[in-house]
């Protein structure tokens, strides 16, 4: 190990503890560990022991999760998984079992308990839906779908905001065995068609208009253009949503019908239809999810009903310590995998809060108001939003009670170390801050929140149970306390069963198994702390920087740069010359009323040199007016890398601010390298 690396490894080991677990050790993870010890005659003393057993004995582990989390099935499995198969073989899980995802979310005996709270920027009123009402509505949706000919394997799409109708339509599709896919109304026509035209849906649900940032936005023109690009559609169901039916003209959209009229076709006389759950294999497709599509057509990942269910139950119950008494919100749209993850909380019997609108309108308190109003216990958001609150000097701890809140989750991008301090000083000092990380590729997390181990500043607490995750060097060797590629060594039930339109599996293989044969390479760069077991995410592998043979992740730079008050955001990318030499370019977006200066550049260079090393200091530091983000709030380094190399980025539908890419074209400072 070099002196430089040794120093960094020491530094990572000395993280500050911000939260300690309850000494009573009576979490669901502790109870699960006790059961495993009893069942297998083991003496697993703590989370680390349990984690090691879960990856060494993964078939036994997943069988115990099935039992502990109470999965409902009509036929029990014959085999958990074939242990002779590698993760790259995409083995079948729980062969022989028959179940239904929707049934597992709607099985609760207390039909009067609130399943969904729906709040929106558009209305003061919060809509409540009990489990009994949700079952009744899903039955009606499903009956209408069956009536129009939707059957097992057909694709049903929601181009919908995060509200009750999206949940009902998704559960109805799942009850039949149809495959659900969704995207949010903030996606433009091209962004939607790049995704859903690939899967040839028969049915689409959408809305007439939405409200965001205090304004009503018409959605009909976009919907009309989307429908034109989907020749296999049999029906378009329109929900007036924030408009009245009278104000909505369906005449330009073929095969369109209002939701009310569509649901009426599911009724037989005055009788409410019975809810029937098709009993399907564990590996039956449930969701089609999409890669970001920032560098090419989005990949269509097919996720199984059983794999999604068991993985989400594991994360909610064992990692989140969730029970039926919890009330959870995740600030998300239907176009992000966190929506699917959130809705699976219904399987635990928890109440789910759906919010549609801006998290900053009418004020930055809107979501904290909901915490106090609804008694929210688990609150999830993107790391970027927490940074924005800190920038605005928001202090929810002094304006809100937040008494019920026990867990605050963050994902979407690496959570900066200073955001940890902000949460504990300005939001709540005894909350579990769970930075969670995984991806759409597994519709879940590799590492995340954990009620049994401490929270260290700047670190994700631990690798999740059953996820054989390591950080590997380019040579394919595990590294500890050093930067490396995030890999998963053993099969997991939540990996996609396949990609849509990938007959021979070549796209799937290229996406995950072309870097290290037989091992899943996730495309993230990370560092695992050998002392704490915590993980630091360092950005996407395609955003990895390697000037002068020093390999590091862009987040290492962001954590330093964005601690400067003058800097509101930053972007760090490599530039290559014709000989293949690399230099690092750092772009700074200045904060309000702050100006870019050579004095600031000097300070930033000095801070990077001290915190990392002289070899981490960017070759050039330039000002930019904007930084490109995807619609789900992820910074897009790889697209800027392409632009500064003189390449055109054609897939602009995935960006929330596509015009920002033009700011990086033909920059004089980047010529003649």
Curated annotation (Swiss-Prot):
Record keyword Endoplasmic reticulum present: no
Catalytically driven reaction(s): acetoacetate + ATP + CoA = acetoacetyl-CoA + AMP + diphosphate
Cited InterPro entries: Acac_CoA_synth, ACAS_N, AMP-bd_C_sf, AMP-binding_CS, AMP-dep_synth/lig_dom, ANL_N_sf
PROSITE patterns: AMP_BINDING (PS00455)
Protein EC: 6.2.1.16
Coiled coil (UniProt feature): none
GO MF assignments: acetoacetate-CoA ligase activity; ATP binding
Keywords, sorted A to Z: ATP-binding, Cytoplasm, Fatty acid metabolism, Ligase, Lipid metabolism, Nucleotide-binding
UniProt entry tagged with the keyword ATP-binding: yes
GO cellular component terms given for this protein: cytosol
Compartments, as annotated in UniProt: Cytoplasm, Cytosol
GO biological process, alphabetically ordered: fatty acid metabolic process; positive regulation of insulin secretion
Pfam family of the protein (one): AMP-binding
Function: Converts acetoacetate to acetoacetyl-CoA in the cytosol. Ketone body-utilizing enzyme, responsible for the synthesis of cholesterol and fatty acids.
Record family assignment: Belongs to the ATP-dependent AMP-binding enzyme family.
Protein name: Acetoacetyl-CoA synthetase
Protein species of origin: Danio rerio
């Amino acid at each position: 190990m070099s002196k430089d690396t040794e120093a960094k490894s020491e530094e990572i080991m000395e993280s500050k503890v911000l939260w300690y677990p309850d000494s009573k050790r009576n979490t669901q993870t502790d109870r699960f560990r006790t059961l495993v010890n009893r069942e297998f005659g083991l003496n697993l003393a703590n989370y680390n022991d349990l984690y090691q057993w879960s990856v060494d004995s993964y078939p036994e582990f997943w069988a115990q999760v099935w039992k502990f989390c109470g999965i409902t099935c009509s036929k029990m499995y014959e085999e958990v998984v074939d242990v002779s198969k590698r993760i790259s073989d995409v083995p079948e899980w729980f062969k022989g079992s028959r179940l239904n995802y929707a049934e597992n979310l709607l099985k609760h005996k207390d039909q009067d308990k609130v399943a969904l709270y729906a709040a929106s920027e558009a209305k003061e009123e919060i809509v409540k839906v009990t489990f009994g009402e949700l079952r009744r509505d899903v039955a009606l949706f499903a009956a209408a779908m069956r009536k129009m000919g939707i059957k097992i394997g057909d694709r049903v799409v929601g181009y919908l905001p995060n509200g009750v109708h999206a949940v009902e339509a998704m559960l109805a599709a799942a009850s039949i065995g149809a495959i659900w896919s969704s995207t949010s109304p903030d996606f433009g026509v091209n962004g939607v068609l790049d995704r859903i035209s690939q899967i040839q849906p028969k049915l689409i649900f959408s809305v007439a208009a939405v409200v965001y940032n205090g304004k009503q936005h018409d959605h009909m023109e976009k919907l009309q253009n989307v429908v034109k690009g989907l020749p296999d559609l049999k029906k378009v169901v329109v929900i007036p949503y924030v408009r009245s039916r009278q104000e909505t003209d369906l005449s330009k959209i073929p095969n369109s019908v209002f939701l009310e009229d569509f649901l009426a076709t599911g009724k037989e006389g005055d009788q409410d239809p019975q809810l029937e759950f098709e009993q399907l294999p564990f590996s039956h497709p449930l969701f089609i999810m999409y890669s970001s599509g920032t560098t090419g057509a989005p990949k269509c990942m097919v996720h199984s009903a059983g794999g999604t269910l068991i993985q989400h139950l594991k994360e909610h119950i064992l990692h989140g310590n969730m029970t039926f008494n919890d009330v959870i919100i995740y600030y998300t749209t239907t176009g992000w995998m966190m929506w699917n993850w959130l809705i699976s909380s219904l399987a635990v019997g928890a109440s789910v809060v759906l919010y549609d609108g801006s998290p900053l309108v009418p004020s930055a308190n809107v979501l904290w108001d909901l915490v106090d109003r609804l008694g929210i216990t688990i609150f999830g958001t993107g790391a970027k939003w927490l940074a924005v609150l800190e920038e605005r000097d928001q202090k929810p701890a002094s304006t809100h009670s937040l008494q019920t809140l026990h867990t605050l989750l963050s994902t979407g991008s690496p959570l900066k170390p200073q955001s940890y301090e902000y949460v504990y000083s300005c939001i709540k000092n005894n909350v579990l801050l769970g930075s969670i990380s995984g991806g759409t590729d597994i519709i879940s997390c590799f590492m995340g929140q954990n009620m049994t181990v401490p929270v260290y500043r700047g670190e994700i607490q631990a690798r999740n149970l059953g996820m054989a995750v390591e950080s590997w060097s380019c040579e394919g060797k595990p590294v500890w306390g050093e930067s490396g590629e995030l890999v998963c060594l053993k099969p997991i039930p939540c990996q996609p069963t396949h990609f849509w339109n990938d007959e021979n599996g070549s796209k799937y293989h290229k996406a995950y198994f072309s870097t290290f044969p037989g091992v899943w390479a996730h495309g993230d760069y990370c560092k695992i702390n050998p002392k704490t077991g915590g993980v630091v995410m360092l950005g996407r592998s395609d955003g990895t920087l390697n000037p002068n043979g020093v390999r590091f992740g862009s987040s290492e730079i962001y954590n330093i740069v964005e601690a400067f008050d003058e800097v509101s955001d930053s972007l760090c990318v490599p530039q290559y010359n014709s000989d293949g030499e690399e230099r690092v370019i750092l772009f700074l977006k200045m904060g309000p009323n702050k100006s870019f200066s050579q004095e600031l550049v000097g300070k930033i260079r000095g801070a990077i040199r001290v915190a990392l090393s002289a070899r981490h200091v960017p070759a050039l530091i330039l000002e930019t007016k904007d930084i490109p983000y995807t619609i789900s709030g992820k910074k897009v380094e790889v697209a800027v890398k392409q632009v500064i190399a003189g390449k055109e980025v054609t897939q602009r539908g995935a960006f929330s601010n596509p015009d920002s890419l033009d700011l990086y074209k033909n920059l004089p400072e980047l010529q003649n390298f």
